[in-house]
C-alpha cells in the first residue's frame, strides 16, 4: 500500500494517486529533471505543485534513473519507484499502476514545473464526476504550433482523441494542442502496457 497522505485527500470517496514519470534521457533536452529553475531542480518543482493539489493521497515519482530517485527520496510527502525502461510516459505509469490500490491515477509529467494545481484539481473532479475512463485536456491551436516539434498536436473527433503528432502530418479543423496531463481509471492505464504499439507513434 503506497498511501502516504490520508483519506482527507479523497474526492467523492475515490482514492487518487499522482504518478510523475521522469527520466534523464531525452531527445530534446538531456538530463532535464535535474535542470535547476531558480535554484531548485525541475522534478522537485513538479513535486511542489503536486503537493498543493487537493485530492492526491499518494504522490509517486516513477523513474528508471537512480540519480532521480536519490534526489526525490530526500523530499517529504512523496515516494519514488525505480521502473524499467519505457518508450512512453504512459507505459511507465502503467507499470506502476499494477502495484497501486487506488481508483484513479493522474499522470503529471516530470517536465511540467509550471503545472497549476487548480487546473489539476479541476481535471480530477471532472473525471470523477463524469466517471470518465480517461481525461486528456487540450487547447486551441495558435499560430506557429504546427511547425513546432515541442508542441504535441492532437486530432479529435466528438471529444475522442484519434491521433497525436509532433509534425504537421495531419492538420484539420479538428487539430488542437495537447496539454500534458492524463487522468484515468486505474484499471484503464494498468492494461495499457499490454496493448500492442501501432505504426503511429508521435
List each language-model region with its residue ranges.
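Short phosphate-binding loop-to-helix
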Residues: 60, 66-125
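Short, Lys/Arg-enriched N-terminal segments with co-localized hydrophobic residues
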Residues: 1-9
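N-terminal glycine-rich phosphate-binding loop and ensuing alpha1 helix
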Residues: 12-63
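Short, high-confidence coil segments that cap the C-terminus of an alpha-helix
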Residues: 56, 102, 130-132
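Conserved core of the sugar-phosphate nucleotidyltransferase
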Residues: 115-198
